[in-house]
């Protein structure tokens, strides 16, 4: 399937998920496993009931084989996410501090490791949805303050930036064209004024 032209420079959701699965996460192995060398990485020696950091994709494989429990990130709790939601409301010009892949990580863990989470899945989904919608409204309001040279996206995640990109790039291109035209007209007007002044002196 050929994507629309305005989406061809964007990452696909599956690509963002793939990138997110390379994030390190803590697991609690249920069995001891010897070190495994892989292309580009290796799984360290795992001891039963001893916490270890591994890429998320490794954790998901071990989890599916009932060989480990996943220790959820500290931010993936109802209490923490509600605090970030309140921050979003209190600070309309700022985005709260969340991990680069918080949306994808939370989605993966809610689907693949719900039994390892400390809070009920439905409550987590609800607060994540509220938080995401609030940030989306703020980011769309921010588009109104675009200028020809930059946009402030501090605090947005990869998925959030990827969703905004099809709207931001065309708008910035138009603004840049308007800016260049204005600058060109200003220079031409200045040149004309200098020529007129020179003609007056000659007279």
Curated annotation (Swiss-Prot):
UniProt family annotation: Belongs to the GINS2/PSF2 family.
Protein name: DNA replication complex GINS protein PSF2
Organism: Candida albicans (strain SC5314 / ATCC MYA-2876)
InterPro entries, alphabetized: GINS_A, GINS_bundle-like_dom_sf, GINS_Psf2, PSF2_N
Gene name of the encoded protein: PSF2
Keywords: Chromosome partition, DNA replication, Nucleus
Subcellular location, record wording: Nucleus
GO cellular component: chromatin; CMG complex; GINS complex; nuclear replication fork
Top-level taxonomy: Eukaryota, Fungi, Dikarya, Ascomycota, Saccharomycotina
Quaternary structure and interacting proteins, as annotated: Component of the GINS complex which is a heterotetramer of SLD5, PSF1, PSF2 and PSF3.
Function of the protein: The GINS complex plays an essential role in the initiation of DNA replication. Has a role in chromosome segregation.
GO biological process assignments: chromosome segregation; double-strand break repair via break-induced replication; nuclear DNA replication
């Amino acid at each position: 399937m050929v994507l629309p032209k305005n989406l061809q420079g964007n990452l696909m959701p599956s690509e963002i998920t793939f990138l997110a699965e390379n994030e390190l996460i803590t697991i609690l192995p249920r069995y001891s496993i010897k070190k495994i060398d892989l292309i580009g990485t290796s799984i360290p020696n795992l001891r039963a009931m001893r916490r270890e950091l591994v890429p998320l994709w490794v954790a998901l494989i071990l989890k599916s084989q009932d060989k480990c429990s996943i220790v959820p990130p500290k931010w993936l709790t109802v209490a923490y996410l509600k605090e970030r939601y309140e921050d979003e409301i209190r600070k309309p010009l700022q985005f709260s501090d969340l991990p680069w892949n918080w949306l994808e990580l939370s989605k993966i863990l809610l689907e693949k490791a719900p039994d390892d989470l400390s809070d009920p899945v439905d409550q987590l989904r609800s607060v994540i949805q509220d938080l995401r919608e609030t940030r989306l409204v703020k980011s769309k309001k921010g588009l109104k303050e675009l200028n020809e040279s930059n946009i402030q996206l501090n605090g947005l995640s990869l998925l959030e930036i990827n969703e905004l990109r099809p709207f931001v790039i065309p708008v910035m291109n138009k603004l840049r064209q308007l800016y260049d035209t204005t600058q060109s007209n200003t220079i031409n007007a200045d040149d004309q004024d200098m020529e007129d002044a020179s003609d007056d002196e000659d007279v």
